[in-house]
Amino acid sequence: LQTIYKTKKNNPSKYLHQILGGWKESADGVIYSNWVTGDFEEREVMCYGQDFGFSNDETTLIKVSVDIPERKVWVKECFAKPNLSTSDIARLNKAYAGISLIICDNSEPRLIRELKNAGLNIKPTIKKSGSILSGVALVQDYKIIVDKNSESIIKELNNYVWKDKGTVPIDKFNHTLDAIRYAMAYLVQGKSSGIYHIR
């Protein structure tokens, strides 16, 4: 009951959808309403998240900084670009992340290996059954502060909705948001124990 009360107080939209089984207050059913724009703050708990695009889909790199006790996360878009080659991704990652840790989409092992060979500190996220919903719930539990110049993140936050008012998110407007999920799963759930996953 304490958990339910805390959810109702801190995240009423999550309470409405998950606890009461209702549709969120937003007319378009956006999944994340727990965000504002503001200045990016670098905290001790920080890494980058990356989602790989295919053809016209964007490859994204997002800087993510978390204050776990305060349940706040700061996110900043480094790039969100379609049609990138492996060398393009390596060059951009080096420019923005340097040798900092990048937690990435695990669907492209060959690409990840090539990025590692290029000198990047990159690891695939570990996905398990139900990873999308649990990852969404994790992000919903935090106040998201979005860098005001992160246009792709803001666009996706305004358009990422539940499919058919159900329990599955639509599979679009999610390239920056998936990158944020990967980074948060590592920083919040797995960093201290040496493992990371989206449960």
What spans do the regions from the language model cover?
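Short, structured patches in soluble enzyme cores that scaffold and shape functional sites
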Residues: G21-W23, S65, F79
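Short, solvent-exposed loop/turn segments at secondary-structure junctions
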Residues: K24, F54-S55, P109-R110
